[in-house]
Amino acid sequence: EFAELEQLLYFLVDEIKEEDEIIVVVDETNVHRNVTELLYHIGKSEENINFNWYEHPLNKDFSKQKNFLNSKCSGDFIFQIDADETPLSNLIDLLPQILSGNPHIEAYWVPRINTVEGITEEHIQKWGWMVNENGWVNFPDWQMRIYKNNRDIKWEKPVHEKLEGFKQFSHFPPSEEWCLYHHKEIKRQEKQNKFYNTI
């Protein structure tokens, strides 16, 4: 995921507002040297942004990892993005206006475009996926990723995590400009599915 993480971080560095912060949490039991070097480089070279990163053991529990991330955030809202995902500029640009214009909303469902390079009909049948004419898997694949920074709002379940503790929620439109992009190669998808089955 190094290439995806690098792409995401430099995208965020270019896009975020002065009052925003970038927080990265990496699995301390599986830290790659190139990832560490990337994080040090961004932290040193981008002194005008609020950038911090932490190592924390995953221990086959994605909710604990995400709740640890939450504990390090200081903003009013959290936009939780996985290393292999990238939002579009439109979403980042309009997000402050949307959040301030809807003060009663505590959490937002974000649509996600999944593409899997090397996918076959056998994979689609095996996993029960739906693939549309654009090659997008299970679109809009709603993800609860934008939520108020509130200690009562937290993640539950070790895998296929679920956000709990909010009352009012909304959905972004299921159109491309509001999406997270999520691209994988089939070998990594198979490896990830096997790992999820062990949790």
Regions of interest found by a model, annotated:
Residues 20, 51, 76, 84, ...:
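Conserved acidic residues
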Residues 1-9:
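A structural helix-start
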Residues 14, 71-72:
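Solvent-exposed polar/charged
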Residues 55-62:
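Short, acidic/glycine-rich phosphate-metal binding loop used to engage nucleotide
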Residues 9-55:
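Acidic donor-binding segment of Leloir-type glycosyltransferases
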Residues 62-70, 77, 86-199:
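Catalytic-site signature of metal-activated, phosphate-bearing donor transferases
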Residues 27, 83, 113:
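Flexible loop residues that form catalytic
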